[in-house]
A protein has these predicted regions:
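Acidic catalytic/metal-coordinating carboxylates
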Residues: 35-39, 62-65
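Short amphipathic alpha-helix used as the core "switch/output" element in two-component signaling
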Residues: 42, 64-75
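Active-site beta3 strand of CheY-like receiver
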Residues: 47-53
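Receiver (REC) domain active-site loop signature in two-component systems and cognate sites
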Residues: 58
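C-terminal output helix
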Residues: 107-117
């Protein structure tokens, strides 16, 4: 069995973020939480994670901008957008930056765990192919 994924939650809603952190910690997932895009980018410069749970609508730097800068910095984490709503233009834009999944808030813990597991498996498979010299 593979190791449990590491997850970064980027969400400006303190209560929602705290609940998610607790729900994932109970399942033995290494989880980190930050409240803004700037903190997320700083965190990702110093720490690798498998999955980023990213809110799109945040004050200051939007989730779209966070995602764009993550990719520019070379972050290879799988990204799951967690948001109350996303407009079509925004959805197209985030897909261009490699969003792997999308969940509406509030989300069911089991569904979130399933999505995190799938994202972790995709990342592990992708990294395994690179290690073996395949693309």
């Amino acid at each position: 069995m593979s190791k449990m994924p590491s997850v970064l939650i980027v969400d400006d809603e303190d209560g929602f973020r705290s609940i998610l952190v607790r729900r994932l910690q109970i399942r033995d997932i290494q989880v980190f939480g930050v409240s803004c895009g700037e903190d997320a980018l700083e965190f990702l410069q110093n720490q690798n994670v498998d999955v980023v749970l990213l809110d799109i609508k945040m004050p200051g730097m939007s989730g779209v901008e966070v995602l764009r800068q993550m990719r520019e910095q070379g972050c290879k984490a799988e990204v799951i957008v967690l948001s109350g709503h996303v407009l079509l233009d925004t959805a197209v834009e985030i897909m261009d930056f490699g969003v792997n999944d999308y969940l509406l808030k509030p989300c069911d813990t089991e569904e979130l765990m399933d999505r995190i597991t799938l994202a972790h498996e995709r990342k592990t498979e992708r990294e395994g192919k690179k290690v073996n010299g395949k693309k």
